[in-house]
C-alpha cells in the first residue's frame, strides 16, 4: 500500500553525495520518535484519497503528518533498501541547516500527537534536546501490579537492586528474587508471580531511571504490544 526508500544528501552543485541514511524496515515506534521515512515515500492513490493530502496547519512537517495518515490506513508498509533519493543541501534547507525552519519541529510534534489521537493512544509528546527527535510519555490508564524478578547469585547485589525499585515512582510492585541464575527457578518465580506484568532484571543492573517501570508499563498498555525493554548499556 505504501513504501519508502533509503536516501542521502547531495551538494548544491550536485557533485558531492554524502550522509547516506540506511533505514530500518517499518517501525511505528521509531516513526513516533523521528520522521525517519521522509524520502522517497510512495502511496497508492486509494490510500491518499481516503486519508487526504497535505494540510496547511502542519507546514514544515506536512510530510510527517501525511505519512502518519497513510500508514494508519495501509495494510502493508514496504521498504526498498536502496538509496533512491538525493536531498539537496543549501543554506535555507533543513538538509543543510536544521535550525533554518524551527517551526517545523513544533509541527512535527503536532503530527505525532494527532496520530496518537486518531489511533486511540493516550500520550503526550515532548521535544528532545536534539532537533527532530521526540519523546512520548504514555498515560497510565491503570496502574497494574508489576512483579519484578531479580535473578543472580550475589545477595548484596540483589538487595541493592531491590531497594532501587522500592524507591521508584511506580509503587505497585511485587519484588521476587531467585537464589541463582537457573532457568527453571526463574520460570518458577514467573509462574507464581502475582503481577499482571513481569519485569526481569539482572542483579548486575547498576542504575534505573525513576520512571522506568511507568514508562514500560505505559507501552505495554498499547494494543498488540506484548513485551518491552529499555536500553541497557554495559561497561565494555
Predicted regions and their residues:
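A recurrent flexible, glycine/aromatic-enriched loop bordering the glycosyltransferase active site
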Residues: 10, 16-42, 46
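Non-catalytic membrane-proximal stalk/linker segments that position and tether the catalytic domains
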Residues: 22, 92-164
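Donor nucleotide-sugar recognition loop
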Residues: 52-68, 100-103
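Catalytic donor-sugar/metal-binding loop of nucleotide-sugar-dependent glycosyltransferases
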Residues: 58, 68-86, 113-125
